Amino acid sequence: MFFENIKKLVQYGIDTGLIPECERIYTTNMLLEVFGEDNYEDTDISGQEIVLEDVLKVLLDEAVARGIIEDSIVYRDLFDTKLMNCLMPRPGQVQAEFAKRYEVCPTEATDYYYKLSQDSDYIRRYRVKKDRKWTVDSPYGVIDITINLSKPEKDPKAIAAAKLAKASSYPKCLLCVENEGYAGRVNHPARQNHRIMPITVNDSAWGFQYSPYVYYNEHCIVFNGEHTPMKIEKATFIKLFDFVKLFPHYFLGSNADLPIVGGSILSHDHFQGGHYTFAMAKAPMEETFEIKGFEDVEVGIVNWPLSVLRLRGKDSDRLIELGAHILDAWRGYTDAEAFVFAETDGEPHNTITPIARKVGEIYELDLALRNNITTEEHPLGVYHPHAQWHNIKKENIGLIEVMGLAVLPARLKEEMEILADYLVNDKDISSNDKIEKHASWVETFRGNYEAFTEENVMSILEKEVGIVFTRVLEDAGVFKCTPEGREYFKRFIKTL
């Protein structure tokens, strides 16, 4: 069984093109060394289907049985990455192949790289497949919802081991270029099967890679070669468009650079993009304006729950100039009546979540206006999911959510399943610790439906979760989608 699965793993590498046929013996010997095995017996695997997840499971069980690793998801993930490293081409080979294909066409290069990132098990397809995904109609278009299940939950043993592990500042964070080839440790994932594409944006060295958790098609991360903090400035817009010019089929956006309205990693300058059209990109402009000195740029308010200005034009340099002008104006903008304060007690509040894309021959720059002010009533943020929705979403509204994709916590999968049972069988929701937090939310929609049945209950819950996410996005909008809110928005635009 052991030798059979070693052979299957090598065959998988050949079948996917990770290794050539001429490296069969070499790769076999590398895998044997990882197991401390001196012997090898050839077996016949012809006609057998090779499923990577199954092959790795057998080999991981063998590693546990041999006492090489502890039987926990953290150690298993570290070890199977070590196994996959035996099948990986060197970074230089991957970069050369990418460059060769890029000469033909950028799409061919990214297709090759995206497939490699999955075949290598850096993107664990079998975990990503577990994510729950659905769409919901909203007043702003079709919203995407996903419950992320591909990030493994750490077990108590690994958490305890991580506390005892000696501190290491290498790599400095999960986005540093030093992750490429890193063996990992109990509190840092292994990245031996990871390959980074070096690119140049704004005349500086950056890296291009895919997210291991792919929230949407070809979800990529573009990060600074230096460990330097997030900062939204004019140079940000230059970098975004430099990337879009390299890969015109991809959009690229940045999280905001302030807490509450920013992403989870503010310590390392990075962007996220991909080959996907979000609801926000499809949303039309509800009204257009002319900005003095920028008459050649189309500017409009996007029909979207967050406060978004869209700039359109054939010359990206003009969008960059106008984007910088709007950013500067917004950073210093206060309108007490609209409850917008540029700063309180010296702490700045206004920033922007920008997204760049190319549509045909036209460049677009979407600027979502953000503000992170807090009050006693809303201690986590006035323009942040309000407390009544925290049963569904209380995390920051980052770039991905801004564009119309809800990334919801894994706990919701089980909670929705329990809720479904309670609704169908008319049980008391507040009697169950796991779902009592949803009781008042359920009462807001219970009366809208004649009956909850096993056939309709899950689609009802999915729809209602989508409605909550739309409300959450409205909470994050600085200028509301009301006549009054639109007047406040136009008041800001007039200052430009």
Predicted regions and their residues:
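Coil-to-beta-strand transition motifs
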Residues: 215-217, 249, 264-266, 279, ...
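Catalytic or ion-translocation cores adjacent to nucleophile or general acid/base/metal-coordination motifs
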Residues: 235, 244-264, 273-334
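Active-site microenvironments that recognize anionic phosphate/pyrophosphate groups
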Residues: 1-229, 303-305, 319-320, 329-405, ...
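Helical scaffold of the NTase/Pol beta-like nucleotidyltransferase catalytic core
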Residues: 193-197, 227-252
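Beta-rich nucleic-acid/ligand-interaction surfaces
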Residues: 259-267, 345-351
